[in-house]
Swiss-Prot record:
Pfam family, one: PseudoU_synth_1
UniProt organism field: Methylobacterium sp. (strain 4-46)
Positions of substrate binding: Y111
Gene3D superfamilies to which the protein is assigned, alphabetical: Pseudouridine synthase I, catalytic domain, C-terminal subdomain (3.30.70.660), Pseudouridine synthase I, catalytic domain, N-terminal subdomain (3.30.70.580)
NCBIfam families: hisT_truA
Enzyme Commission designation: 5.4.99.12
Record protein name field: tRNA pseudouridine synthase A
Amino acid sequence: MPRYKLVVEYDGSGFAGWQRQAADRTVQQALEEAIARFAGAPVRVHCAGRTDAGVHATHQVVHLDLDRDWRTDTVRDASNAHLRPEPVAVVSAERVRPDFDARHSALRRHYRYRILNRRSPPALGRAYLWHVPWSLDAHAMHAAAQTLLGRHDFSAFRAAECQANSPVRTLDQLDVARIGDEILVATSARSFLHHQVRGMVGTLMLAGCGRLDAAGVRAVLDSRDRTRCGPLAPAAGLTLTGVDYPEPGP
């Protein structure tokens, strides 16, 4: 069976996350149903990162097997035709080797978190950011973020229901920068724990308002205690923006 790699974009606001559930609408369900309509048979799609309810993606990657050889532009366009009016779009489709796996072949995942840092609430785009009305120091947040880089036990930022076998992860990037009224947090790692990014952002917010310094943020990490973590940043501000893979061989 030919295998396809899709890049998928979605607004996670109205979904109960990526993974198919018995009762609630999910991104996986919407995509599988759309592809099955044109392919004429049930399909199963496998993603690079299972986003939570309310989390968005501009570059989610999935793989799937179809029972016949379809043109890649047909896979893309037919999927999008059947996805309407869902806020999900297939950006691109390509044929890949049978051993390509959207999750296990990934080298790195990239996320962005948006904070609107001004007194006035947003009139537009509130489903895509966290409004923090008190003043935040982005430089202090960035300095604190650097103490989290590297290979560590991230239990302090891990959800209680996280099913990962190990809390140890290697954080490759955690940058914080202000652009006008927005503070953007960019982070990259091979993989993240459940709620890790949102937990880190909530803790960095405390550094931004002066309640923690860089040493205090590092102390949260070293404690391995979830109760020491800052507030869990809302899902709305988080977007999966990219997934890296090895260059295909000859």
